[in-house]
Swiss-Prot record:
Native species: Desulfosudis oleivorans (strain DSM 6200 / JCM 39069 / Hxd3) (Desulfococcus oleovorans)
InterPro entries linked: KH_dom, KH_dom-like_a/b, KH_dom_type_2, KH_sf_prok-type, Ribosomal_S3_C_sf, Ribosomal_uS3_bac-typ, Ribosomal_uS3_C, Ribosomal_uS3_CS
UniProt-listed SUPFAM superfamilies: Prokaryotic type KH domain (KH-domain type II), Ribosomal protein S3 C-terminal domain
Gene Ontology process terms (BP): translation
Alphabetically ordered keywords of this record: Ribonucleoprotein, Ribosomal protein, RNA-binding, rRNA-binding
Matching Gene3D superfamilies: 3.30.300.20, Ribosomal protein S3, C-terminal domain (3.30.1140.32)
Annotated gene: rpsC
A GO term, aspect molecular function: structural constituent of ribosome
Protein name: Small ribosomal subunit protein uS3
GO cellular component annotations of the record: cytosolic small ribosomal subunit
Entry keyword Protein biosynthesis: no
The organism's place on the tree of life at top rank: Bacteria
Paired cysteines (S-S): none
Complex formation: Part of the 30S ribosomal subunit. Forms a tight complex with proteins S10 and S14.
Similarity section: Belongs to the universal ribosomal protein uS3 family.
């Protein structure tokens, strides 16, 4: 089962927490759609900033966005001009009439964040870099920054082949069935001249909960 399911969803409430934190009764579906639109808008608007994830918290008519970015300077801009412009655009296009607060957090090691690694590999594929070279670069740079293991999967018409196939490259351990393992996951689709290529990245950063069996 661990091989099939999203590793972050499988670990929610164990070693992972929710990226949307709020409670709603009748407006539940509306809030889910609004969260989806918020994330899509932020990622499209700030695609050069290296957005790892967007956390959303709600209280009454207030929404707080926490944006994790590899290049926070692009998001903030000179004297905070860019972030004010972003706030205004979100208020106009996505969350009309709601109070909005935005926090920016820097991602210290983007080479160890699965979503950013996947985006980097996908970007190389779109620039016609050989898929094996792109995968090996991603793996070697992550291992250099001290992760316990990484696995990258590319699937589609690799190298312009007639038949779609799936290839993967792994280094270290990536225990997808171990629930106490901190496994980061990222997925991106690369749009190439031959069609779309899916890029999945799994990064194992170590075990969060101690193994109680060793004590007994």
């Amino acid at each position: 089962m661990g091989q099939k399911v999203n590793p972050e969803g499988l670990r929610l409430g164990i070693v992972k927490t929710w990226q949307s934190r709020w409670y709603a009764d009748k407006e539940y579906a509306d809030f889910i759609l609004e969260d989806f639109k918020l994330r899509e808008f932020v990622k499209k608007k700030l695609h050069h900033a290296g957005i790892a994830k967007v956390e959303i918290e709600r209280s009454l008519n207030r929404i707080r966005l926490r944006i994790f970015a590899a290049r926070p300077g692009i998001v903030i801009g000179k004297k905070g001009n860019e972030i004010e412009q972003l706030k205004n655009e979100i208020r106009q296009k996505v969350v009309a009439g709601k109070d909005l607060a935005i926090d920016i957090q820097e991602v210290k090691k983007p080479e160890t964040v699965a979503q950013l690694v996947a985006e980097n590999v996908a970007g190389q594929l779109e620039r016609r870099v050989a898929f094996r070279r792109a995968m090996k670069r991603g793996v070697s740079s992550a291992m250099r920054f001290g992760v316990k293991g990484i696995k990258i999967i590319c699937s589609g018409r690799l190298g312009g082949a007639e038949m779609a196939r799936r290839e993967w490259y792994r280094e270290g351990r990536v225990p997808l069935h171990t629930l106490r393992a901190d496994v980061d996951y990222g997925f991106v689709e690369a749009s190439t001249t031959y069609g779309r290529i899916g890029v999945k990245v799994f990064i194992f950063k170590g075990e969060v909960l101690k193994d109680e069996r060793k004590k007994n």
